[in-house]
Every structure is written in structure tokens, then in C-alpha cells.
Swiss-Prot record:
HAMAP family: FliW. Acts as an anti-CsrA protein, binds CsrA and prevents it from repressing translation of its target genes, one of which is flagellin. Binds to flagellin and participates in the assembly of the flagellum. Interacts with translational regulator CsrA and flagellin(s). It is found in: Cytoplasm. One of its GO terms (biological process) is bacterial-type flagellum assembly. Keywords: Bacterial flagellum biogenesis, Chaperone, Cytoplasm, Translation regulation. The lineage of its organism: Bacteria, Bacillati, Bacillota, Bacilli, Bacillales. Belongs to the FliW family. This is Flagellar assembly factor FliW. Gene3D superfamilies: BH3618-like.
Length: 143
């Protein structure tokens, strides 16, 4: 199918590339289908693009690129919702806010996106009782 995207114009995607957020994203509960697209060839960043809304796209990256010791436990409800059977099925992404200069850019570590890559199910998880920030500076080490 062809979708309209924020950063790449019209783009051909396969149905099996679609990631389903059963409950939508916080603030975007009606948006349930997304696809991951490259931002550029050599970038650690990718685009989490809504299949339904052209303008709804987030720059995301693995938080481990910037924060090697990042970690959290998933609650049983999330494990069941995402049908996670193995840790190898899980990919974690952080939504980034890219600023100029890049050193001012931040990552939302308090609300990571957890994806079951085998089942193509995802959820943005809110880490209550966490010391992580919604605007954690990432610095320039991935440039």
C-alpha cells in the first residue's frame, strides 16, 4: 500500500511492516497503525510514521545508543497486551526531540515505546516511579 509520510512523501509499505498500537499512543488514541522508516542511510534515528495521518511522525532511536545502562521491567499487563514470549522479540525505542544545535536534543526515557517485533504489536509504556526524564539530554555522541 502507498502512504503519505511527513519526511518521505508518498512511500510504498507492505502490510506486514505495520506496527499496531492496540490502544493508540497517549494523546493520539485513534492512531493505531504505524510503520518504521529510515530517516537517512547511516543514521541511528528512524521515523515512527502513522499509516493514517501524514503529519504524525516521530523521530525515534534505541535509547541504548545514548544510555548504555538504560533499563526497566515490563509489567505483566504489558507483556500480555504485546503477546511477548521472549526478550528477543522486544525492541525498545525512545521518542526524540531534535534541537539545533544537536547537543540540546532530548530523549523521552520515561515513556519508551516497546515493540514486539515478531507480532508487530507496540505500546508506549509510562514508567511510573522512575528517575528517568521525559526530556533527557542526549548530547552529541551519536552525531
Amino acid at each position: 500500500m502507498i502512504i503519505k509520510t511527513k519526511y518521505h512523501g508518498e512511500t510504498q509499505i507492505q502490510e506486514d511492516q505495520t506496527i499496531v498500537f492496540k490502544n493508540g499512543l497517549p494523546g493520539f488514541t485513534g492512531e493505531k497503525k504505524f510503520v518504521i522508516l529510515p530517516l537517512s542511510e547511516d543514521s541511528p534515528f528512524v521515523v515512527l510514521q502513522s499509516v493514517q495521518s501524514e503529519e504524525l511522525a516521530f523521530i525515534v532511536a534505541s535509547p541504548f545508543v545514548f544510555f548504555k545502562d538504560y533499563g526497566f521491567d515490563l509489567d505483566e499487563t504489558t507483556v500480555e497486551l504485546l503477546e511477548i514470549e521472549s526478550a528477543e522479540d522486544v525492541e525498545v525505542m525512545a521518542i526524540l526531540t531534535i534541537e539545533e544545535p544537536f547537543e540540546k536534543s532530548t530523549a523521552n526515557l520515561m515513556a519508551p515505546i516497546v515493540v514486539n517485533r515478531r507480532k508487530m504489536l507496540a505500546k508506549q509504556v509510562i514508567l511510573h516511579d522512575s528517575s528517568y526524564l521525559t526530556k533527557q539530554p542526549i548530547g552529541g555522541e551519536a552525531c
